[in-house]
């Protein structure tokens, strides 16, 4: 196999004393092998592959640009190495299978633009356009485990809204309006998932410990939570009351849009800071304050202080 990546990941930060600048003038493109360290990912390839198409890599390895090497002869490129193997395969073969997920296609597109691989840039852009054209439907995953939920949220480049509803968790009878309010929460979730399709990841959870609870996530962490249930007393008997805090749910959904990526560059930190968003404030905090911020979640429990006075609601 012409290109291979080392399994061990090394640091991309190399001391200045261990590096030197060299030029590849006068080399034989057909036979020379090159060792590349791309952001800590190690690759072997040939000069023929690197100079086959008119890209930035051809400029680097045909003598038009100087390259940086370490003491062991690895050529250092200060980029993420995740998709560099795909770049090499495209340079060698002129075609390559694209990733399935939109996020990975966008990542590959950014690398192709950096290395000036115009053909791959066009293929990535066409693939993204096709996804917009042929995948207009709304996908709402129903999680099967907490591990699956964590993976979904951690790997998504979108803010997320999760509705947990699980009637089987209730130990008591419901108040008279609870069934209607439970249905209203579910219907609102469906409406929001259609309204913000493509911008927000919506998740259903029917295995959790709560009866009805909304959770809102940004940049992979929980930002807010709205719990819609409480326990009330009616003639010395406990009952479960389900509320429908429509305005609060709309408010938290709009708040979570502040964490939406802008043109693939992440959320607008200036906007987050101006509106009090946590991510926008993070660069002003020391390590302890940052840890406290990450652990802090805005939790709203919908419960009226006069519940005992409304025994038969």
Curated annotation (Swiss-Prot):
Residues with the Phosphoserine modification: 23
Domain BTB: 32-100
Pathway listed: Protein modification; protein ubiquitination
Residue numbers carrying N-acetylmethionine: 1
SMART domains per record: BTB (SM00225)
Any single GO CC term annotated in Swiss-Prot or TrEMBL for this entry: nucleoplasm
Record keyword Nucleus present: yes
Phosphoprotein in keyword set: yes
UniProt KW keywords: Acetylation, Nucleus, Phosphoprotein, Ubl conjugation pathway
Residue numbers covered by motif PCNA-binding: 239-245
GO terms of biological process kind: negative regulation of Rho protein signal transduction; proteasome-mediated ubiquitin-dependent protein catabolic process; protein homooligomerization; protein ubiquitination; ubiquitin-dependent protein catabolic process
A GO molecular function held by the record: identical protein binding
Domain of life: Eukaryota
Family the UniProt entry places it in: Belongs to the BACURD family.
Subunit structure: Homotetramer; forms a two-fold symmetric tetramer in solution. Interacts with CUL3; interaction is direct and forms a 5:5 heterodecamer. Component of the BCR(BACURD3) E3 ubiquitin ligase complex, at least composed of CUL3, KCTD10/BACURD3 and RBX1. Interacts with DNA polymerase delta subunit 2/POLD2. Interacts with PCNA.
Function summary: Substrate-specific adapter of a BCR (BTB-CUL3-RBX1) E3 ubiquitin-protein ligase complex. The BCR(BACURD3) E3 ubiquitin ligase complex mediates the ubiquitination of target proteins, leading to their degradation by the proteasome.
Protein name: BTB/POZ domain-containing adapter for CUL3-mediated RhoA degradation protein 3
Annotated organism of origin: Homo sapiens (Human)
């Amino acid at each position: 196999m012409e290109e291979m990546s080392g399994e061990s990941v090394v640091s991309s930060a190399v001391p200045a004393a261990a590096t030197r600048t060299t030029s590849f003038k006068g080399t034989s493109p057909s036979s020379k092998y090159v060792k590349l360290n791309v952001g800590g990912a190690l690759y072997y390839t040939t000069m023929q592959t690197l100079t086959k198409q008119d890209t930035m890599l051809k400029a680097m390895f045909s003598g038009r640009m100087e390259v940086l090497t370490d003491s062991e002869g690895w050529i250092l490129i200060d980029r993420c190495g995740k998709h560099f193997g795909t770049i090499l395969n495209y340079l060698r073969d002129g075609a390559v299978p694209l990733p399935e997920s939109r996020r990975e296609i966008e990542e590959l597109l950014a690398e192709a633009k950096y290395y000036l691989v115009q053909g791959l840039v066009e293929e990535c852009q066409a693939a993204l356009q096709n996804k917009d054209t042929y995948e207009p439907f709304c996908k709402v995953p129903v999680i099967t485990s907490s591990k699956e939920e964590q993976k979904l949220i951690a790997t998504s480049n979108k803010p997320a809204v999760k509705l947990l509803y699980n009637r089987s968790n209730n130990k008591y009878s419901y108040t008279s309006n609870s069934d209607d309010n439970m249905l209203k929460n579910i219907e609102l979730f469906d409406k929001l998932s259609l309204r913000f399709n493509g911008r927000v990841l919506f998740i259903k959870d029917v295995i959790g410990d709560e009866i009805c609870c909304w959770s809102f996530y940004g940049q992979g962490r929980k930002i807010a939570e709205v719990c819609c249930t409480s326990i009330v007393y009616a003639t010395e008997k406990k009952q479960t009351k389900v509320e429908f805090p429509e305005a609060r749910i709309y408010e938290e959904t709009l708040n979570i849009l502040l964490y939406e990526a802008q043109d693939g560059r992440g959320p607008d930190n200036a906007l987050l800071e101006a509106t009090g968003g946590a991510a926008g404030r993070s660069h002003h905090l020391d390590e302890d304050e940052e840890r406290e911020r990450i652990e802090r979640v805005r939790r709203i429990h919908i419960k009226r202080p006069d519940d005992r006075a409304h025994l038969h609601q």
